[in-house]
């Protein structure tokens, strides 16, 4: 039980510290990549949804 709370504490702390990265700007040399960087967090969600579509295609075996 203690391990679960420790893991939750670590996750919350890392989320709080990494939230400052959400507002960071890319260097000017990479400014043309801004649209791609904005879409990148959505990509894992698309793979998650693809798993359901794939399972529906094979009738949830």
Curated annotation (Swiss-Prot):
NCBIfam families: PRK02553.1. Keywords: Chloroplast, Membrane, Photosynthesis, Photosystem II, Plastid, Reaction center, Thylakoid, Transmembrane, Transmembrane helix. PSII is composed of 1 copy each of membrane proteins PsbA, PsbB, PsbC, PsbD, PsbE, PsbF, PsbH, PsbI, PsbJ, PsbK, PsbL, PsbM, PsbT, PsbX, PsbY, PsbZ, Psb30/Ycf12, at least 3 peripheral proteins of the oxygen-evolving complex and a large number of cofactors. It forms dimeric complexes. The keyword Chloroplast applies. One of its GO terms (cellular component) is chloroplast thylakoid membrane. One of the components of the core complex of photosystem II (PSII). PSII is a light-driven water:plastoquinone oxidoreductase that uses light energy to abstract electrons from H(2)O, generating O(2) and a proton gradient subsequently used for ATP formation. It consists of a core antenna complex that captures photons, and an electron transfer chain that converts photonic excitation into a charge separation. It holds the Pfam family PsbK. It is found in: Plastid, Chloroplast thylakoid membrane. Belongs to the PsbK family. InterPro entries: PSII_PsbK (IPR003687), PSII_PsbK_sf (IPR037270). GO terms for biological process: photosynthesis. HAMAP family: PSII_PsbK (MF_00441). Residues 1-24 form a propeptide. PANTHER family: PHOTOSYSTEM II REACTION CENTER PROTEIN K, PTHR35325. SUPFAM superfamilies: Photosystem II reaction center protein K, PsbK. This is Photosystem II reaction center protein K. It comes from the Eukaryota. The keyword Transmembrane helix applies. The chain crosses the membrane at residues 40-60. It is a single-pass membrane protein. The lineage of its organism: Eukaryota, Viridiplantae, Streptophyta, Embryophyta, Tracheophyta.
């Amino acid at each position: 039980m203690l391990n679960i709370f420790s893991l939750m504490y670590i996750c919350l702390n890392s989320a709080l510290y990494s939230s400052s990265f959400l507002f960071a700007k890319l260097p000017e040399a990479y400014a043309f990549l801004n649209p791609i960087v904005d879409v990148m967090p959505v990509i894992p969600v698309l793979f998650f949804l693809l798993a359901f579509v794939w399972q529906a295609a094979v009738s949830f075996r």
